[in-house]
């Protein structure tokens, strides 16, 4: 599945869309809205198509929507583990088949298969748990970063990039294409680098993110599904950051995706997405991520491995 990124780099200022104001989030009403066909069988539509492929985050989010419809109201997802096994066809709807693997008193497991052309393109297992108190609790400390109110959004950053007289000629077309796309999430990078000065960077990035529009407090299951969508955004691109000054992306897709849900949160409120890549090699990259609430609570942990094939970066002086 495709993993969106900024033009020829891995930073999380990829795409934007016009905010719907006070309207209910388009992620809930359209992007993650499934059509029930039969018991435990659903059809998804309304696909965002970056790089002519289905966006992996949308498939993960829709699969979790399907799984959540088969469990009781008093249980919530605590983990999911997914594999992308075939490229999705953006011209066709996706069928989601849910298997009720186990329903227990505390934990329940659901297996979800996403199907096109009669073959699975994606498989997922999600585990749900009833809320339970525990005296054993700890978490890492949230990174200290500027609040989202002090940072520029991607729309403003793209305008600044396009006005930069030192911007390399290969970027304006890609930036204008990005600016024309509509994406149902808002992004504010913590430390965006100028595109005119590609340089070696640490395989780490942070950005504030939230769903556009209003989701509300009532449905925690939907907030988890929206977070699943958000979690794949520019995630794998973190592995590119140390290499973007000498290589450009030839091919990049997600192989798998895992998430662990720790605490309640609202996906329509700002959360800090902390991403890092501890390893890359063998035409693969590994990335880890943490979604933090603004009050410092660790809400979600993510991990992903993907295929990354690159070509040498050709300087404009050699063109």
From Swiss-Prot:
Family, per entry: Belongs to the C/M/P thioester hydrolase family.
Assembly and oligomerization: Homodimer.
Gene field: ACOT8
Source organism of this protein record: Homo sapiens (Human)
UniProt xrefs under NCBIfam families: tesB
Effect after changing residue 78 to A: Reduces Acyl-CoA thioesterase activity and peroxisome proliferation
Entry keywords, A to Z: Fatty acid metabolism, Host-virus interaction, Hydrolase, Lipid metabolism, Peroxisome, Peroxisome biogenesis, Serine esterase
Listed pathway(s): Lipid metabolism; fatty acid metabolism
Gene Ontology molecular function: any one: long-chain fatty acyl-CoA hydrolase activity
Protein name from the UniProt record: Acyl-coenzyme A thioesterase 8
Cystine crosslinks: none
Motif placement: Microbody targeting signal: 317-319
Stretches for region Disordered: 1-20
């Amino acid at each position: 599945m495709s993993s969106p990124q900024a033009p020829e780099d891995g930073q999380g200022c990829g795409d934007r869309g016009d905010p719907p104001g006070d309207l209910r989030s388009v992620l809930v009403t359209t992007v993650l809205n499934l059509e029930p066909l039969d018991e435990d069988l659903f059809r998804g539509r309304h696909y965002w198509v970056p790089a002519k492929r289905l966006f992996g985050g949308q498939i993960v989010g829709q699969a979790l929507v399907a799984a959540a419809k088969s469990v009781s109201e008093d249980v919530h997802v605590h983990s999911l583990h997914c594999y992308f096994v075939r490229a999705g066809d953006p011209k066709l709807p996706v069928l989601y088949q849910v298997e009720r693997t186990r329903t227990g008193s505390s934990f329940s497991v659901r297996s979800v298969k996403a199907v096109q052309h009669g073959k699975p393109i994606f498989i997922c297992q999600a585990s749900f748990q009833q809320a339970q108190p525990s005296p054993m609790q700890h978490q890492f400390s949230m990174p200290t970063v500027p609040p989202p109110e002090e940072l520029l959004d991607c729309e403003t950053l793209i305008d600044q990039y396009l006005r930069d007289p030192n911007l390399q000629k290969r970027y304006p077309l890609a930036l204008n294409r990005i600016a024309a796309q509509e994406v149902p999430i808002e992004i504010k990078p913590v430390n965006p680098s100028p595109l005119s000065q590609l340089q070696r960077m640490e395989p780490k990035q942070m950005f504030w993110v939230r769903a556009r529009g209003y989701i509300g407090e009532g449905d925690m299951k939907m907030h988890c599904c929206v977070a699943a969508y958000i979690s794949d955004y520019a995630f794998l691109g973190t592995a590119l950051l140390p290499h973007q000054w000498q290589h450009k992306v030839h091919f990049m897709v997600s192989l798998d995706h895992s998430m662990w849900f720790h605490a309640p949160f609202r996906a329509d409120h700002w959360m800090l997405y902390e991403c890092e890549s501890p390893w890359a090699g063998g035409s693969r990259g590994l990335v880890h991520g943490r979604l933090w609430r603004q009050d410092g609570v660790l809400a979600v942990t993510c991990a992903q491995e993907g295929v990354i094939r690159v070509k040498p970066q050709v300087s404009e002086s050699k063109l």
